[in-house]
Amino acid sequence: MDSKELSNGMKITEIDIPGVYVFETPKYRDKRGTFTVPFNLKEFKEATNFYADFVQDNLSTSKKNVLRGLHYQLKKPQGKLVRVIKGSVQDVIVDIRQKSPTFGKSFSIILSSKNNLSLWVPPGFAHGFLSLSEGTQFFYKVTNDYSPENERTLLWNDPELNINWQTDNPILSEKDVEGKVLKECTLA
């Protein structure tokens, strides 16, 4: 993994799946509290070579052990910049770009309000997270509008993906229970 530090102190690391980046944002403290800059378009573009035209910000609040995902969209794939405002999650992505040398590879990272990390998930990935604390607030920016007719769910515990989730018994939506294994998924 290759890391670089920007002029504002933010560290950016490209993981071993091309196009995926972890951002470590500095948190400045003084007697008044803290201040951080979670996103700067110019620095994001320079670091990722991707112009992110974010169209919407989303915030979900989850109970402990809630697992959301693994979601993706067919015709209108979303890039996502994700972070935790309160609590912590195990964030997981799966490369579903059929022509990618890392197709089917997963990546897992702990994101929390304490470690101040963000993850850039480019279009072409399934994404999900497991809430590790009560009342976790998960914030994410997306590059395409939500498209229910294009949304699909990759089964969270597909044995082929070998994801080491930090629970065996998550709280799931009906949609996520009915996800498909990768070899049965419709991909763009």
Question: What spans do the regions from the language model cover?
Answer:
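Conserved metal-binding segment of the jelly-roll/cupin
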Residues: 111-134
